[in-house]
Amino acid sequence: MRLGLKEKSETKPVLIVGAGPTGMTAAMELSRFGVPIRIVDKLLTPSTTSRALAVQSRTLELFEQRGLIQEMLRIGNPATAATIYGNGKCLGQVHLEQIKSRYNYILLISQAETERILREQLVRQGIAIERGTEMINFSQLESSSQAGQGGVKAVLRNFEGVLEELEAAYLISAEGSHSMVRHALNLQFQGKSHKQSYALADLYLDGDIPDDELSIFTAEHGFLGVFPMGNRHFRFIATDPEKHEKTDDDPTLAELQKLYDEDSHIPVQLRDLTWSSRFRINSRMLHTLREDRIFFGGDAAHVHSPAGGQGMNTGIQDMIDLSWKLAMVWHGKAVPDLLNTYEEERLSVIRGIVSKTETATDAFNSDSVIVHQLIAHIAPVLLSTQLVQQLSTGLISEVAWNYRASSLSQTDRVHGNLRAGDRLPDLDVSIWESDASGNAQSGKARLYEIIDPSRFTLLVAGGESTTDLSPTWKEQLSPWDGFLKLQRITPAPNQPEAKIQFDRSFGSGQSLVLVRPDSYLGFVGDHDALPALTKWLNQWFPPIAN
């Protein structure tokens, strides 16, 4: 048996328009899965300004699995708390060290550096970004979502004005907020534009602002944020009440100092302005992420307030979700309906992020004295509770989002807390293998060291450690040889806390947990759930006879 849908595999490349973090993540992922790609960007050179700054825990986990984490950690500056000030005093802290991840902080790193790390990875994978190349027209070849049919015809124009007509299997719009593809398809980018103007800058400062915390100040006319990038280099963002009318002039150091002094009670001296700009917040999103063979991700699909540092992370995770599914369908290893789950899963996350960042922005930017008095009185109470700390750190870090409502997620009788659609927690475990004599041998590992981001991993969790996997199991799963990795795990020895976390997650009995390539769970069941699992596999990834 082999896995695949006969005569349904593709040959044409996937065209990615836009080479920011979203587009480069798509290129990296699709290439890893053996899908030919073209990635174009109309800019001749990469941007050198920092723009997005925060890399969240969930993104760091995904980057670790793809070999990018060491360079990120070498350059980035971790922030372990977010301190909120108002009325000249500290109102409370969000304790980021409570994030349920190995990366229990926000890593502050210039977007230009994040893009450099992704570009270097593309070079290692043999991918060249076609810069100075713009897609000027496109059309869908056929109104069909069936694999092996249809496609997208695109017209590209390079920096010399040379035109090229390209047929692609799929098109990914990662062009940013002014997506030509979105406009051409007349898709509604629903939401609102905030009236406030903001000053944004990278600069250095002297004073008592911590190097390992996000410092956020509330004021009657808006808010001020000062975020450490390391070595006294900071990102500065503030509501600029005097610039509500559209203006193209960049704020000066003197203007930034004035904004700081008006909003903060902590004396500092700003210096050495690296760059600055003004902007307004748009809070908008598409309500569909797919038009047949065309997919949207990142700012082409959603833009929102920078509150919480979610934007770039959301775009990267859009492509982590889409790419493995697109690759499976491209290779003929999955039913075409798998692609519908991209929109199912990511739209729910996007709606939540847009809603929550908009609420926070409206509150902090309110010109109502009453609202700011409420913040000053309520924030200390809320931030002192463990529940609010858990909720806030889970959402900020993006480790709390799940795909439980997805049609791809199936839970079948479980005893632990994990459900299909959840992110796999990175626990310390014992792994079990059989030696040449059939005897079980164990080793110790982290779950994220075990799972394979290029295929599914079936974890057989718990049960008797000396019991080998049943030959019947292996026989029933044989149609998916090479498609999924089978691994027995038990709690790590001599670690009481690790056993508590293991039992809380998987239950005290034996369970079957199928981990997707993006480390979310596709199927969760107890030890008798193998028939339900094979039915699930047949539904989405049916094998066929040679």
Segments predicted by a language model, with ranges:
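Core Rossmann-like FAD-binding/catalytic domain of the broad FAD-dependent monooxygenase superfamily
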Residues: 2-391
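Helical substrate-recognition/capping region of FAD-dependent monooxygenase/halogenase enzymes
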Residues: 2-17, 32-33, 89, 101, ...
